[in-house]
């Protein structure tokens, strides 16, 4: 009798543990956890821009230079080497003498995995960019009122800023018009940082076609292209390429007990 009671007790405890485990299991990640599911045309445009050095002041660095796929979307360096550096990843060099970079970026390059998820509402190491419904743009940022309307997510808003930094992508004052505008704090408006970069993109027929395909309701001619459209596309590519939700654990959460 005692053994029977012990057996029944163990069964009850086991069932209770299973029920508890199932009730506390996290929900699987789904499309609803992300800001959007971009079109293939938007992702293709974002991919092209992500790897293109044309959106840097001196045309010598792209987003992918520091957020390299082969380095886990980072660069493997404790302090990143931005504009003016040579090489990729751990082989990236600051140069020397007159060819040396003006300064290293005082932080490492963050990854882009799952940053398109809605749970991320703050960007940058110091939180200087965040979602804020009280701001006209929808974001509290160092650009203040210069940040344009129409940015799809905080990740897209983040993509507006590396191009304004002298050590990241803009270059030093005196080297190019983009760097000069950044040095003077002219981010928005005619011949501001973002407009100067948009002018470059408008002058490339292949990009005009890609922008039209990605945003047919907003863009019909080259003159319609704004840098915020480029930022939205870059964020869409980062969101699609950096989405990591198909591990064996993710599969288990979706109901695959054999994962």
Predicted features along the sequence, with ranges:
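Periplasmic c-type cytochrome electron-transfer domains
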Residues: 2-7, 20-259
């Amino acid at each position: 009798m005692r053994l029977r009671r012990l057996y029944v007790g163990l069964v009850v405890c086991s069932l209770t543990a299973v029920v508890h485990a199932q009730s506390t299991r996290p929900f699987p990640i789904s499309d609803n956890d992300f800001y959007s599911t971009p079109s293939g045309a938007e992702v293709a445009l974002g991919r092209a821009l992500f790897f293109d050095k044309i959106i840097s002041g001196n045309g010598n660095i792209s987003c992918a230079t520091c957020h390299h796929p082969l380095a886990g979307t980072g660069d493997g360096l404790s302090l990143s080497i931005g504009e003016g550096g040579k090489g990729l990843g751990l082989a990236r060099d600051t140069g020397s003498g007159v060819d040396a970079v003006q300064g290293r970026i005082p932080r490492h390059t963050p990854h882009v995995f799952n940053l398109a998820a809605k749970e991320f509402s703050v960007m940058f190491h110091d939180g200087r960019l965040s979602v804020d419904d009280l701001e006209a743009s929808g974001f509290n940022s160092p650009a203040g009122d210069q940040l344009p309307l129409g940015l799809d997510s905080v990740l897209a808003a983040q993509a507006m800023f590396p191009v304004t930094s002298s050590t990241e992508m803009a270059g030093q004052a005196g080297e190019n018009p983009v760097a000069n505008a950044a040095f003077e704090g002219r981010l928005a408006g005619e011949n501001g940082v973002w407009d100067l970069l948009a002018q470059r993109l408008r002058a490339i027929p292949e990009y005009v076609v890609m922008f039209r395909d990605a945003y047919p309701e907003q863009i019909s001619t080259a003159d319609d292209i704004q840098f915020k459209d480029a930022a939205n596309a870059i964020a869409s590519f980062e969101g699609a390429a950096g989405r990591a939700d198909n591990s064996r654990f993710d599969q288990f959460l979706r109901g695959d007990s054999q994962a």
